[in-house]
Swiss-Prot record:
Protein task: Accessory protein needed to activate excisive recombination. Appears to serve the additional function of repressing the production of the lysogenic repressor.
Presence of the UniProt keyword Transcription regulation in the record: yes
Organism: Haemophilus phage HP1 (strain HP1c1)
Annotated keywords: DNA-binding, Repressor, Transcription, Transcription regulation
Lineage of producing organism: Viruses, Duplodnaviria, Heunggongvirae, Uroviricota, Caudoviricetes
Record family assignment: To phage P22 cox.
GO function terms (MF aspect): DNA binding
Protein name (record): Regulatory protein cox
């Protein structure tokens, strides 16, 4: 059996999600850029549903900050 090196990364986040508007402001980009990154699969987002459980065209979109942190951590240690 081979040995594996274990790496532990602790990340503190005040919130696991951020609206696309907040995220765009933090990155100093437009919401259209965030939408394009979402469509390209670069950003994992959750589209909130209305009271009937249906997604709407103008529904709230939340960016999954945890998914971004996990992806970046994995990419940082690839050789």
């Amino acid at each position: 059996m081979s040995k594996q090196n274990a790496i532990c990364i602790n990340i503190h986040m005040e919130q696991p999600y951020m609206t696309r508007e907040e995220f765009a402001k933090k990155l100093d980009v437009s919401t259209r850029t965030i939408d394009r990154l979402r469509q390209q699969g670069v950003l994992k987002c959750i589209k909130m549903k209305n009271d009937e459980g249906e997604e709407t065209e103008r529904g709230l979109v939340l960016v999954d900050l945890v998914a971004i942190a996990v992806r970046n951590a994995k990419n940082a240690f690839q050789i």
